[in-house]
């Protein structure tokens, strides 16, 4: 397939173990072309996530510019990075990026996002698997990009459609909770958004045996095995899961296999203060209430359920194909 026929993707990310899984999944997709990798705080500080993105793209031969982005939320204070999940270095503390030092491409992620979208109207999908600060900043820089983007696909939110609520708090998913004001800005902008939240991603489990089989199949699988030993152990202890959830991979899978997802349509708002800060709430189309904060905002799509086994199989097929 010629590059001009491929779907262009800006991957907004905070690598992150499952971010690394998603990036390698994207590399394996012949119908996609990465236009940029943009980084943000989240699983680690922006300096660390940027280094990790540069390391991953160089190690696995992914020819794409990496642009560093926001280092803190729009309004609230930055919370501590979850080193207990992803390690101090964001990639499992196995020493993968030790002594690695490469500078990102020039320019702020939000500015480059705007430029790429304006240069390719109707062709660019933003895949955001991190706090949504870069996207909110891009909208502030040029609101006109909302009418030019093809789609915005988010790994974020917890809407309770699948019985799952938060992982950062009892009601808030981590990416949205890290910058709730940015998330509300993104969900209320007049552009297409599809959210693949914990309702789906927490059911997409690559088992220990899946990871072991991929590790025996080539460098990509072995690398993912190495960085995810502590990650997998955390899932076992905290969630009683034999393996780990493919949060970011599930959102990436939507780009190439949307038929695996059942979507619900309706306006989405995010709580930006109080005990429920970071909670994402969808008002379904056709449900009639009195005047509310959802009024006047365009509908967004939220995944309520999916073919979980199909998503896991797509991931395994992708990683095996990389050798």
Predicted regions and their residues:
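Short, glycine/acidic-enriched capping/hinge loops at junctions between secondary-structure elements
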Residues: 21-23, 48-49, 77-79, 281-283, ...
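Short, well-ordered secondary-structure micro-motifs
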Residues: 77-79, 163-165, 206-208
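Active-site histidine-anchored catalytic micro-motif
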Residues: 3-13, 17-55, 95-201
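Metal-dependent C-N hydrolase catalytic cores
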Residues: 7, 50-119, 297-310, 316-320
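Short secondary-structure boundary/hinge segments and terminal tails
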Residues: 44-45, 74-77, 204-205
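Conformational coupling and interaction surfaces
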Residues: 2-6, 25-26, 33-34, 174-177, ...
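A residue-level signal for conserved active-site and pocket-lining positions in enzyme catalytic cores
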Residues: 66, 186, 252
């Amino acid at each position: 397939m010629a590059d001009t026929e491929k779907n262009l993707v800006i991957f907004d990310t905070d690598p992150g173990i499952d971010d690394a899984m998603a990036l390698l999944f994207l590399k394996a997709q012949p119908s996609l072309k990465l236009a940029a990798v943009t980084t943000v705080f989240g699983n680690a500080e922006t300096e660390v996530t940027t280094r990790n993105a540069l390391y991953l793209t160089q190690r696995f031969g992914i020819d794409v510019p990496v642009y560093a982005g926001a280092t803190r939320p729009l309004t609230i204070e930055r919370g501590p990075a979850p080193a207990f999940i992803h390690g101090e270095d964001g990639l499992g503390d196995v020493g993968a990026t030790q002594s690695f030092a490469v500078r990102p491409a020039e320019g702020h992620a939000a500015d480059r996002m705007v430029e790429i979208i304006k240069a390719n109207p109707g062709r660019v999908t933003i895949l955001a698997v991190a706090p949504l600060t870069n996207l909110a900043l891009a909208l502030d820089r040029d609101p006109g990009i909302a009418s030019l983007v093809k789609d915005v696909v988010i790994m974020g939110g917890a809407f309770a459609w699948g019985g799952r609520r938060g992982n950062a708090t009892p009601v808030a998913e981590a990416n949205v909770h890290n910058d709730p004001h940015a998330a509300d800005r993104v969900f209320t902008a007049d552009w297409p958004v599809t959210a693949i939240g914990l309702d789906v991603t927490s059911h997409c489990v690559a088992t220990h045996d899946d990871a072991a089989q991929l590790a025996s199949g080539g460098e990509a699988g072995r690398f993912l095995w190495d960085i995810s030993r502590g990650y997998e152990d955390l899932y076992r202890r905290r969630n009683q899961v034999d393996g780990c959830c493919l949060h970011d991979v599930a959102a990436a899978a939507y780009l190439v296999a949307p038929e695996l997802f059942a979507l619900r349509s309706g306006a989405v708002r995010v709580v930006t203060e109080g005990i429920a800060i970071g909670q994402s709430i969808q008002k379904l189309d056709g449900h009639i209430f009195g005047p509310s904060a959802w009024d006047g905002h365009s509908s967004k799509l939220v995944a309520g359920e999916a073919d979980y086994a199909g998503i896991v199989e797509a991931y395994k097929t992708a990683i095996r194909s990389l050798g």
